[in-house]
Amino acid sequence: EIASCLVGSEMCIRDRYILCLAILCVAIAAPTFAGEYQTGGDSILRTTKYGRKQLAITKILAAFTLFVVTFLVGITVHILILDAAFGTDCLKTSFQMRYSIINLPNINLGQLQIILAAAGLLSVLATVSCTLFLSAKFKDTLTVLLISIVVLFMPLFAYVAMGATWLSTILPSAGIGMQNNFLSQLANFNYLNIGGMSFWTPHVILISAGIELFVFTFLAIHSYCRHQVA
């Protein structure tokens, strides 16, 4: 009963918390480059010795540092508060006992907390990297923010409409949401097929987010360096 309460209530609250944190990070990241394009400050910074690639890398590293620290502090406080409220006696309970003995992950609820936090951080950073790329590509902060919000919620809408598909799992924010969150994917047997191979959706989500984190970061730097001042 305690385990059911923990997973059913605490994990649900954590999913919503990570989603809200992702929205906040996207809103903060949107004007990173686009804000300077709008004010014209970009044209001044580009004339300095380190005004292109080095500046882009510094801005991105500063943004990632801010978001990682914010996420880790927030999720740690969040876990401590919820564990204090629901109790820690059930953290050694098997994840398989809560859902089904045939669930693939052979972990306990304490390990599940760490896995969900790590997956949430990776998804948030991948989503932020996409926002940074859009910010380096477009000159209007509002446009960047609107597109980023659409990208953030697209996996949720895709999952509700079509279930577990490639569209609902390969986007940066695939592990963030309600029905499509990483916890629900761990608890289910959703597989995606390509050719003669099958891939478990949690693996697809993590691998895609990891690849997109590096790809979008590189594209953000490249786009900023190639941006032409009007």
Label each PLM-derived region with a short phrase:
Residues M11-C12:
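Active-site loops and adjacent core secondary-structure elements that bind or stabilize anionic groups
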Residues G87-Q111, L142-L145, V151-H227:
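Terminal transmembrane helical anchor/hairpin motif
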Residues C25-A29, G41, C130, A220:
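Hydrophobic/aromatic residues in alpha-helical transmembrane segments
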Residues K53-G74, H78, I115, A119:
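Alpha-helical transmembrane segments of multi-pass membrane proteins
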